[in-house]
Amino acid sequence: MEKQYLTVTALTRYIKTKIEYDPHLQSVWLKGEISNFKYHSRGHMYFTLKDENARIAAVMFAGHNRNIKFRPEDGMKVLVKGKISVYEASGSYQIYVHDMQPDGVGNLHLAYEQLKVRLEEEGLFSRVYKQPIPAYAKTIGVITSPTGAAIRDIITTIKRRYPIGNVIVFPVLVQGEFAAPSIVQAIQTANEMNDIDVLIVGRGGGSIEELWAFNEEIVARAIFASKIPIISAVGHETDFTIADFVADLRAPTPTAAAELAVPNILEMQEKVLQRTLRLQRAMREIVHKRQERLQTLQKSYAFRYPRQIYEQKEEQLDRALEQLVLAKERYMEKKVNQLKQLSFYLEKHHPAQRISQTKIAIETLQKQLRREMQTVLQTKEFAFVRIAKQLEALSPLKVMMRGYGLVYSEKNQVLKSVKDVSAGDVVSVQLQDGILDCNVSSVKERESNGK
């Protein structure tokens, strides 16, 4: 019988098909320790999950890991859910993780601190974004479990302190896998309503695992995005969750949250009573002072003798009118005098007179300018004639007219000595009326005795 050989690829695909069609391997929960953790630039996570005796490669793609509530690290113990498959290129089986959460309280605390630091850096805890709690809320929304002590304590406290307040309960899961989405949905539903003044979000006490829904990032961001002020009331006084840091106000217990959400109607009634009494006292004092003022006015001279007051005011009016007429006449007289002074000044400084004076001054300056120019021209003319005569006396042409000439070498240089010329050289002699080109037949130097 002829043997049939499989290719490595065919065998690997066969094994992969067997694994992927095994229903027990399509939804596997594993727990182990992370090692060789790598975070790819595209958002994928690659790591090894191991225990004391074995290890398995693990991949968590970006679409699944963006919702996990902590940052995985080497050495962290985790619980993962995923499916088993084969990576054909290396022929190794690995788990494709769909969900991951810390394993144990220590790792929950680590995830809590990681999220707390990240949200604080983003500013979700800043007081800048805290909304004020209304002093007199008409409608109070309560997001908690519909059963248990928390809802009972909140409603009892609100009805005792503020019976006129309206309470709307949004029942949610407060622990477990689906608690966080349930709380987020309730916050969003409450914000879609227009008649809720304040929200209380919380539950009774419990372990860190039981309170973990209030440490979820989606709950923190829903609280931060709420347009309705939120009071957090999670656990006991010593319990602090991420929701407490993001909320607009943190209450140590659900009962305390109810007390912070509404005023005490008995205290309000006492304040109203005190202010009513103060208002009544103030009104009595005002009425008393007005009555005393009225009595004083009734006893005054104006009320007792109004006719005399009227006649006095008429006399004062007549005097004021006389003073007004006199003041008007004085004012007119003053303005007439000012007008006369201005007329005299304008006549004295009339433009025609100033133009005439300026014209005479210009004519005088023109005559003076002509005289000065003539004098300067004559002076310059005399100087020019003198300098021209000096130049004429010094001119080489003047000397040439007396029979002298200038001798030039072939290089057109003036010859000053017979030593600069040799027999046979050609020289040029410039005379008054032209130039002679001459050949030197001999050179004779003057003797020391002048011969």
From Swiss-Prot:
Its main location: cytoplasm. One of its GO terms (molecular function) is exodeoxyribonuclease VII activity. InterPro entries: Exonuc_VII_L, Exonuc_VII_lsu_C, OB-fold_nuc-bd_dom. It is found in: Cytoplasm. GO terms for biological process: DNA catabolic process. Keywords: Cytoplasm, Exonuclease, Hydrolase, Nuclease. It is an enzyme of class 3 (hydrolase). It catalyses: Exonucleolytic cleavage in either 5'- to 3'- or 3'- to 5'-direction to yield nucleoside 5'-phosphates. The keyword Metal-binding does not apply. Pfam families: Exonuc_VII_L, tRNA_anti_2. Its EC number is 3.1.11.6. One of its GO terms (cellular component) is cytoplasm. Bidirectionally degrades single-stranded DNA into large acid-insoluble oligonucleotides, which are then degraded further into small acid-soluble oligonucleotides. Belongs to the XseA family. Heterooligomer composed of large and small subunits. This is Exodeoxyribonuclease 7 large subunit. It comes from Bacillus cytotoxicus (strain DSM 22905 / CIP 110041 / 391-98 / NVH 391-98). The lineage of its organism: Bacteria, Bacillati, Bacillota, Bacilli, Bacillales.
